[in-house]
Amino acid sequence: MHGWAIMAALDTSRSLDDTSFLVFRSTPSRSMHYMCLSLNESDKIRLINAPSDVVKVVHDAIQTYYTYGIQRFENYGSVPEFKLNGSPWGGGENYSKHGRQLLMLLMDCLVKLGFGFAISADVSAKYHSDSDNSSAQYKIDVHSWWFARPIS
């Protein structure tokens, strides 16, 4: 990555509106393709900077292996977005169990396409706050995962 490699994503605050900060180290330059699997709200997957082969494999894997299926597939701006049925990263033990299983499967699919896991980080400062000013506050988005593969 142009002479820099990611070392860590650090969370140094419990504040809801804070994000991870990324630590890099200097390395010899290497041509890599980076993409992000971004988990949004309680039921969305966005594939940022993902090549078309990845989008197809992810789509097929979700349709085949995620019990509750895809509610909608469309672009969010220029980014492919899958809105899943249920709340795989937001609620209910059953949905969460299937969501975790799906994420491990997607990670395996990306590895088979030559991608390596680079880092997981909280990069969204969005959070929900009840309108009645109660203490019910929680982050809307969970960690995003970055993957890299050499450009050949």
Q: Where do the protein language model's features map onto the residues?
A:
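Long compositionally biased, domain-poor regions of proteins
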Residues: M1, A5-L10, R25-S26, T64, ...
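Short, flexible beta-strand-to-coil junctions
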Residues: T12, N40, N49-D53, V123, ...
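Short secondary-structure capping/turn micro-motifs that flank functional sites
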Residues: S15-D17, K126-Y127
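Short, structured interface segments
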Residues: T19-P28
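A residue-level signal for beta-strand positions that form part of recognition/binding surfaces
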Residues: F21, K44, S144
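Surface-exposed interaction/gating patches
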Residues: T27-P80
